Amino acid sequence: SLSAREQSHLSVSSLLLRGKSAEARAAVYEHVKEWPCDVLIAQMCTSVFGLIGFSGLPGREAEQLSFMTNLTPNYGDDWWCKAQLAFAQLEVGQLDEAGINIEEALLSNPNSAHSKHIRAHLYYENLQDEDGLSYLQRHWENYDPSGALYNHISWHVGLWSLETGNLEQMWNVLDKHISPDNSQGPPLNVLTDTAALLFRAELAGVEVTPERWRDLSAYAMTKFANPGLGFADFHAAITHARAGNIEALENIIANAKGPVSDLTKKVARAYLYMQDANWLSASELFTSVVREHARFGGSNAQRDLLDFSLAACLIHQGRKREAKTILAITRPRALQKDIISGLH
């Protein structure tokens, strides 16, 4: 017969596999009360793509930190726990604490791609772009392209290449390591990383051919035909808007589901307005979303797209001072370099 722990394993896993994410999240909490060091179950609620990250709940970043803080006393010097705690800390702005924990995690397991990825986020949040690119590129070049994080780590390299002015390298990384044609990564990463890098490039004033957007729109329709995962849907909305695939975009607006469907519909409509150069209507929708876009899940770095989109809409209206004020409060990194065209 199964032990109580094994029965709980099966129950939690069954809920997750059946798509009952809210129930699975609650079941994880119950499981780790009794067996806190059961990493297979605990990890379901960790990181920005986990059951807390994609819960759609207001305050989910604080909940993520609380979850990891409560687990930590049971793990001692375990590198995995320190890395996950560091990620939760840096996402709420506890950068010094995150730095201590991620360095300790890397000392214990210097070969962890997950820990290196978290260290890259710390470089990003500390505005250390050149140092971050140098650090990550050394490790990325020796990382197996079939690795689970290869696609996303490539995105960080490509993004930093863009932000440090190396466009040739950005396109090389995008085409060979991120885009659907060549990536071995999970579809969620392939779509979101490709869309994000292309749109961030456009926001910075780099020309992106319509063919790139049309190809990615076709990929999004194949892999994410039915709206439901808000983080994927808002990247698909960008893609469909830029590709001129209005039917697919309107499908997201009409049929968005899940815990962030309210935000998804607003963002999708905002990108439709952007495509029509209706900057005022787009900026009004983005303004209503930015204060709670953490509900989408993903990292601060990934959701910069939304803050930068609002700024771009304001700039197009001649409201540059407002754009600068908002970014100074929300994402001051945008003021450091020319990463939004027309801001300076």
Identify the role of each PLM range.
Residues 1, 22-32, 58-73, 95-106, ...:
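Alpha-helical repeat scaffolds
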Residues 15, 49-52, 89, 122-123, ...:
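Residue at a conserved register position within TPR or TPR-like alpha-solenoid repeats
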Residues 17-20, 46-57, 86, 92-93, ...:
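Short coil/turn linking the two alpha-helices of tandem helical-hairpin repeats
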Residues 198, 266, 272-344:
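C-terminal non-catalytic interaction modules
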